[in-house]
Amino acid sequence: MSARLKGGLFVRYKQMERKLRLLEIREGYVRKEIETLKREERHSREELDRVKSVPLIMGQFLEPIDSSTAIVGSTAGSNFVVRILSTVDRELLKPNTTVALHRHSSAIVGVLPPEVDSTIPVMGESEKPSVTYGDVGGLDVQKQEIKETVELPLLQSDLYRQIGIDPPQGVLLYGPPGTGKTMLVKAVANHTKATFIRVNGSEFVQKYLGEGPRMVRDVFRLAREKAPSIVFIDEVDSIATKRFDASTSADREVQRVLIELLNQMDGFDPAANVKVIMATNRADTIDPALLRPGRLDRKIEFPLPDRRQKRLVFNAITSKMSLNDSVDIESLVCRPEKISCADINSICQEAGMLAVRASRYMVTQRDFEEAYSKVVERSGTQPAFYN
């Protein structure tokens, strides 16, 4: 091999050697850069975890300003302009969405699922009442009407579609206290597979401005999400009284709750499989706007029981009791005093307690006589508007 060729190969070898050293140096720089970036990523994740660490503040997303800031409402009733963490999915930020806020900066650090802020009791299959229609003595007309209003549209919706009519959306149960309104609703909840949501009207009256209407929206949103469902609002007269020129902020807030309730009732799709049951002792105080057809299509009255109803209620309650042969239920039924179904239940319970007090295993007629006198005297007279 000639000296010139050997010299050329040596020069090329040296060049390749320098390039290799240069690549090794660059590789070292890249490795250090990767380590630095990993360290920064680890620090950033630790910082993000620290920002997201509990306790956080729950708030309500109202509206976005731009991609990085938004307006949120706090549980204290104030609104704030806050930053949105870059890791938060913007697609989940819808109006009235519940969000988690940083406890110091109030920045939005996450979106909470709807169930997190749900103070609304939802009864599952295992939590539904065990009351059946057979446990409710009498009330045959009321049972039939509530079945047609609530059960049939949920179980046989095709029947209404073939006839060409819209099923009733809501029903109002009204009558004196203790006439079986709530107990019949429990039987409805037991006999249907629908989700049962029960709230009391007074629960919508909250301390802070806007909380009551928001809770109404949450109730009906939850009902639509879990359809088929039944919404039962007990003591609805606490939020649905006739509107007037309110002079206090509390009265105005109650009227806002009523307006939101009217809006939600109007927003129902007949095919949504959501039924509303409301109960009250004072139907005469309910706002007429709520009573019109299209909102509460059926009004079912629960009067004080007549002689036949008393007999059926007594028989339903005493069927599970150990009675002496001397017990004459008919003598209690024929008495002229106006008593409710709850009074009849109290009479039977009191008679049973008298037997327990005397260490007896059977209830006698004398126990019923003493219990009747005690309960009727305690119940007194009914207010004028129930007569």
From Swiss-Prot:
Organism, as annotated: Encephalitozoon cuniculi (strain GB-M1)
Location in the cell reads: Cytoplasm; Nucleus
GO CC terms:
cytoplasm; nucleus; proteasome regulatory particle, base subcomplex
CDD domains from the xrefs?
Answer: RecA-like_PAN_like
Please give the PROSITE patterns that the UniProt record associates with this protein. Answer: AAA
Q: Which family does it belong to?
A: Belongs to the AAA ATPase family.
Q: What is this protein called?
A: 26S proteasome regulatory subunit 6B homolog
Keywords from the named record: ATP-binding, Cytoplasm, Nucleotide-binding, Nucleus, Proteasome
Any matching Pfam family: AAA_lid_3
Under InterPro entries, the record lists: 26S_Proteasome_ATPase, AAA+_ATPase, AAA_lid_3, ATPase_AAA_core, ATPase_AAA_CS, NA-bd_OB-fold, P-loop_NTPase, Prot_ATP_ID_OB_2nd
In this chain, ATP is annotated as bound at: G175, P176, P177, G178, T179, G180, K181, T182
- Upper lineage ranks? Eukaryota, Fungi, Fungi incertae sedis, Microsporidia, Unikaryonidae
General function of this protein: Acts as a regulatory subunit of the 26S proteasome which degrades poly-ubiquitinated proteins in the cytoplasm and in the nucleus. It is essential for the regulated turnover of proteins and for the removal of misfolded proteins. The proteasome is a multicatalytic proteinase complex that is characterized by its ability to cleave peptides with Arg, Phe, Tyr, Leu, and Glu adjacent to the leaving group at neutral or slightly basic pH.
